[in-house]
Amino acid sequence: MPVVAAAVCPHPPAIVPQLAQGAAGELDALRAAADDAIAALLTAQVDARFVVGPAASTVRFAASTGGCFAPWGLPLRVGGPDQGPPVLPLSLAVGAWLLERAGGAEITGYQGVAADAGPAACAALGATLAAAADRVALLVMGDGSARCGARSPGGDD
């Protein structure tokens, strides 16, 4: 019941070219790196695949759940075939978009993690996901730090 494959990708809405508009070209390298990570993840022989990312609360969404980029100006629906209201938070919607960009992949579900979840809660959640099947893969979506260099916002802190 181990996690046998994982990829970590960023989830800024600007990774979606239609949302980045004029800056789309500036993010080509980021999209290519995410594509490479997803491709490696999809080659793993697994029994379950989850997309994990920050959310307002810790909640599991079914694989059929959809998301939409309309709050960011693009009425693009992503994720599962559920025709109900799109409810995936941004992080999971970007994960769904990346998987669709890679040609689609069967997933077991989406797992939102409360931003204020502590280490013990995250470890327990990880154990629960790992126990979901004999071989588990995780696509983990996260925010990057703005403090990446001296010229970055807050870089001198």
Task: Indicate residue ranges for each PLM-predicted region.
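Acidic, glycine-rich active-site loops and adjacent beta-strand->loop/helix elements
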Residues: 13, 56, 115-117, 145
